[in-house]
Amino acid sequence: MSNVLVIQSSILGSYSQSAKLLDNFAVEWKQKHPTDNIVIRDLAAEPLPVLDGEIIAALGGNGELNERQKAAAELSLNLIEEVKTADYVAIAVPMYNFGIPVQLKTWIDLICRAGVTFSYTENGPQGLLVGKKVLVVTTTGGAHRNTATDLALAHIQAVLSLVGLNDISVAYAETLNMGPEAQERGLAEATKAIQAFIAAH
């Protein structure tokens, strides 16, 4: 039995293409692996606290903590534990104004912790969350792949690499706002990549 962590990050609810793609992934994965444990964390439905001075001090373990800081530090460790125990991680990464959703950025801020999920060495940072396979499902309204504006995918890949998640597959659904035919092609391509990931594992 494997553990699968699914991270939803879209704010669009039932209108979200990335959410639909990732929901379909979870359903198809369960059909192939009925005994696997799937944990779904919806960052829009259950928002995380945004990083601020108090929280970053708590994550650094600086001094006596107030109740809010204690809760944030505990939440951070719980989020990290979800990743640690997962064999597979699937993440929805819709592009908003060339970046990632703030909800996803907040999750990143709570799991990227020096000495916990990565360490600094004389050769640079070394990730500590190794040995996992990741599926990134990214959606864009326009055509950005392999261009300077493909910033959402570049961001999440850099962050995942920082913490040791280097085995990354990408399902890319682009041109979703460029007409019905372009949308259909984009979704079909992403669906094919998702199915290939499932078939390979």
Swiss-Prot record:
Under the heading Gene3D superfamilies, the entry gives: 3.40.50.360
Note one Pfam family from the annotation.
Flavodoxin_2
Name the reaction it catalyses: 2 a quinone + NADH + H(+) = 2 a 1,4-benzosemiquinone + NAD(+); N,N-dimethyl-1,4-phenylenediamine + anthranilate + 2 NAD(+) = 2-(4-dimethylaminophenyl)diazenylbenzoate + 2 NADH + 2 H(+)
Concerning SUPFAM superfamilies, the annotation shows: Flavoproteins
Q: Name one GO molecular function term.
A: electron transfer activity
Can the keyword ATP-binding be found in this entry's annotation?
A: no
Describe how the cofactor binds. Answer: Binds 1 FMN per subunit.
Where along the sequence do coiled-coil regions lie? none
- For the ligand (FMN), the binding residues are 10, 16-18, 95-98, 139-142
* EC assignment: 1.6.5.-, 1.7.1.17
Biological role stated in the UniProt entry: Quinone reductase that provides resistance to thiol-specific stress caused by electrophilic quinones.
Quote the PANTHER family the UniProt record gives.
Answer: FMN-DEPENDENT NADH-AZOREDUCTASE 1, FMN-DEPENDENT NADH:QUINONE OXIDOREDUCTASE
* UniProt subunit comment: Homodimer.
Return the HAMAP family for the record: Azoreductase_type1
The name this protein goes by in its record: FMN-dependent NADH:quinone oxidoreductase
Organism from which the protein derives: Tolumonas auensis (strain DSM 9187 / NBRC 110442 / TA 4)
Phylogenetic placement of the source organism:
Bacteria, Pseudomonadati, Pseudomonadota, Gammaproteobacteria, Aeromonadales
